[in-house]
């Protein structure tokens, strides 16, 4: 099935360069820069709109989680056809919006870590509903099959579960060694949660919230207490994880959860994106200001391209 938050790629790339307050566009075939937007603040994560014509991008503000400096309060609306900033949505407070996701009804969801909440936003009216979830969420993921939103708490060994229809927290999943980046498989049945204190990714059942399996990031140096991210390919075949301080990434078979590949990266790997051919992926190396293209089956780095400083998130469209 098609996951609205994880659509097949296309001929273009859009990328956030948060340290430069920019969003950049590249040709996916040549990796040549084709456009650039000067953003109103440090822009971190993105999601495509329901009609695929726009991208919603979180304007997080300065600093990092737990050390916010001048936290922002905006979601940027970017038009893909014109490669331009259309407008911004005010989320109602300086909450440092970060992770953004769409549900099947067209609601835009965002984290509000400085309000211990998630935000439900109507993109057409800019109306915002704040839903407290009992902790500071930095990342969210949505299972359309189960009608749930999952939010990871970087400062706790927990992931909150929100019922999308009721718009309230219904459970709290205990996660070993903290919770960092999270992702849901395209079919909606598996939740992947990166650990903070170990080089591991935990696989949970989105229906029962039971821990199914723990995946080690084999080959990584294994530095504790660091940012880690995970994504599942749009076709559901691969799970990718990055380990920020280790400068390392790994690829797993999504069916067997066996590690297929692991490879060293340039400094500070962060967000993944997936190419149109379903055989390659992209990985933003934040501190190096370089994005890698690699083969999913082998982890072999095939190409790379330079970006503005602080590349964090990339989408192929």
Q: Model-derived features: where do they sit?
A:
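Predominantly soluble domains enriched in secretory-pathway, periplasmic, or organellar proteins
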Residues: 1-317
